[in-house]
Amino acid sequence: MMLQNIKNRLDVVAVLLVIISVGLIQSSTVLGGDQSLFVVIAQLLDSGKTLYKDLFDYKQPGIFLFYLLAGKTFGWSDIGIHLFELGYWILFSLILFSCIRNYSLFRADYFNSLLPLFIIGAYYGNATIFHLTQLEALINFPLFLIVWLLDRAYKTESGLFVTYLVIGVLIGIVLLSKLVFSPIIFFFLLIHFIFTLKSKDIKYIFVKQIIPLCIGFVIPLSVFLSYIFIHQIENLIVDIYFKIPTSVIALEDQVDPDRLLSSLKWFIKKMLVLLLLAVLGVFLITKKESHFFSLIIAWGVIGFLVILMQKTSWWSYHFQLLYVPIGVFAAVGLDFVLYHFLQKVKPSTPLIKSFLIVTIVSLVFFNQMNTLWKGANSQNNTRKYSFDYARDDAAKIIQVIKKEDSIFICGNPRMYVLSSHLPELSTNGWILEYYLDYQWDEFYNEFKNKPPTYLFVKNDYDKLIESKHVKLWELMMKEYSEFDSVENGKWYKRI
């Protein structure tokens, strides 16, 4: 028994070391445009500015709070943000180690320790500048906690009130991170209540489950509502959460089937072996864990539909929402394959058995290891992991900009971070293609009343601005002269 415990601990340590290693390799990756925007908004919040009012964005507050915590913990640098994320994944790994052993998922006990590799290891192995520290990846942690706690509540009646209270809090956190995840939550609860009805009545569900769940949900919701009312942004929240999304979805010029196809190709290419193993794993569901597996299947199916719903996006990072369901079933599938392979081969010593296991697991993650290896050893490494085109574009401005100057970026918000000048206009120059007509009018009025010292317009945004609001473009060309032409756009200085 003691020998088995030591072996289990060695497995856990080995997996943690792998995750820490790949996380540290990825920590040198520069922040992409989306992630830089999150940093900018988090820095604005840290300086006392108001969410949405001082810099507009469509996203719910969860991701901004994550970046705020990251920045306050390890600093606002690329490495600081990524190290905070690595700590987040280490915590998730420890939770997986702790709770997954209570299930009967695998024939071989060591797969309980390997599971984080199928989720977090796959994520780090696949991720590029566009995928790291995106919400769709980060949300896997609280979603898994909801699944685990729902399953725990289904199997035991001890501490039900606290369990459902925590589930409610987690649901609030998920929905305050992205409302579009609500169908996943709905089906989690629907499946859970259906299973519960097999042995309990409606009164039990209402009193023991729904009431504490609602109380828990109200906790994060009330905090956010208090913030809304204190800062008097009620109308803005209604627009951002309900009115604008329906209008943005109707922007047919932003629906790009080729982008969806490209994202699917990227994900399938990276995850092909794991996807095949996951398909096998689905057919190996045990009746004993039918509640848990039903929730995981719902996550995968409804999660994929949620991705398809976002037709004006369809970015490849959206598919990171599926890492847990694919990872769990892929681990179940590989456990089955390895079990029967080892039964047939019958290795003569534990050393040979361990060698075979490590070799096969390594082959399963060949795509991920190959991507990491190419990135870490490429002669053009700056283009792979740490190429910072925004730094090149902003190089001249960084040298000449004064403390009292202001800038506005119609392009990558990373240049705000690099120049140490936060935006003074509420218009979000990173998502102008999603702006509605009335927002262009607001942009014009804001720009006219508070013109920045320097203006950057990325390639193609000049045509976009001119086509969406001629008066705004004419104002820019009248009030500004070209200061610098760079690879990805042009800098202008106010005359």
Predicted stretch roles:
Residues 101-102, 138, 144-166, 200, ...:
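Membrane-interface transmembrane helices that cradle and orient dolichyl/undecaprenyl
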Residues 84-88, 118, 125-150, 161, ...:
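Multi-pass, polyprenyl lipid-linked donor-dependent membrane glycosyltransferases
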Residues 197-200, 207-288, 311:
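Transmembrane-lumen/periplasm boundary regions of multi-pass, lipid-linked membrane glycan transferases
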Residues 162-179, 185-190, 219, 302-309:
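Membrane-interface alpha helices of multi-pass inner-membrane proteins
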Residues 94, 269-304, 330:
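Hydrophobic, aromatic-rich transmembrane alpha-helices
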Residues 186, 190, 373-377, 383-436, ...:
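Short periplasmic/luminal acceptor-recognition loop of GT-C membrane glycosyltransferases, typified by
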Residues 83-106, 120, 145:
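Transmembrane-helix motifs of polytopic, lipid-linked glycan transferases
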Residues 183, 305, 312-345:
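Hydrophobic/aromatic-rich transmembrane helices and adjacent perimembrane loops
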